[in-house]
């Protein structure tokens, strides 16, 4: 080997050796591609949840139904702490797992201003984890609190039936929806009583082990559904947290404001938006939904039901302003 080649080989060997020393002393994590969760949530210390369910529970808070339980049975925590904890675990699980799947169904990017669970963990893992957690909570309830198990399974069936009705309407548009306005409102209220009302009724049944609060909690559930529907199209704060305005319209959801807008003289814009999904038709439809007539009718409906369940509404603590109207 010539002197020149020997010198070149020596230089290359020295460079590779130096690089090896550097790599050995670098943290192994620095050599790995970044976890996609880290890009969204920040440093590794902030990446506490490795599970979609725990992630969404951190957003809402553990046992976030506790104020409702305290109102229904002020002494339950002291008199039967095991059942108290189990009720809260059941409510967390059913509510949050429904949210996880609902965000996938709606193709939502955000939940309460944070990335939706499926954006971080993927649709498959998020959906499967929701099914797993619900299965686990049903099994645990059956084994440890068998008297509560029928309430859980019956209410869950009602919730999913309501969700199924809503999804069929979304799939078929107006073809499977009643034609007359009054019938449409009735259909919406029935769907809401299943989809959301059953969740609130479940709480009362678990705490009291009877149906004595069904009527009241059904009204609380309807108010909650109605409030969410209205925030979706009338609240700038809610739109910011969700990352979009009128997500329900874009998903062809038949919500209360949209049903009212269909009955307006320019309601054909809603139908066009459902059919085409084009930005122009969506914008025209939003104009109809945010019209004074629809806005006032929604406020009247909210006030009517709030007057019956004001104490419960205060516990729910939803305060976004309905500030978007034409």
Swiss-Prot record:
Record-linked Gene3D superfamilies: Farnesyl Diphosphate Synthase
Its GO CC terms are: membrane
Where mainly located?
Answer: membrane
Tell me one Pfam family matched here. polyprenyl_synt
What SUPFAM superfamilies would the database entry show? Terpenoid synthases
Question: What subcellular compartments does it reside in?
Answer: Membrane
Keyword RNA-binding listed? The answer is no
Topology in the lipid bilayer is annotated as: Single-pass membrane protein
- Could you say which residues bind Mg(2+) 1 here? 102, 106
Membrane-spanning parts = 8-28
Biological process according to GO: alcohol biosynthetic process; isoprenoid biosynthetic process; mycotoxin biosynthetic process
Residues that hold isopentenyl diphosphate according to the record: 95
Citing just one GO molecular function, the answer is: prenyltransferase activity
Q: Which residue positions carry a glycan here?
A: 139, 210
Q: So what EC number does this one have? A: 2.5.1.-
Q: Which InterPro entries does its entry note?
A: Isoprenoid_synthase_dom_sf, Polyprenyl_synt
Q: In the UniProt record, does the keyword Chaperone occur? A: no
Biochemical pathway: Secondary metabolite biosynthesis
Under the heading CDD domains, the entry gives: Trans_IPPS (cd00867)
Main role?
Answer: Cytochrome P450 monooxygenase; part of the gene cluster that mediates the biosynthesis of the indole diterpenes nodulisporic acids (NA). Nodulisporic acid A (NAA) and its chemically modified derivatives are of particular significance because of their highly potent insecticidal activity against blood-feeding arthropods and lack of observable adverse effects on mammals, in particular the tremogenicity associated with the paspaline-derived IDTs is not observed.
Q: Which family does it belong to?
A: Belongs to the FPP/GGPP synthase family.
This protein is called Prenyl transferase nodC
Species for this entry: Hypoxylon pulicicidum
- The gene name reads nodC
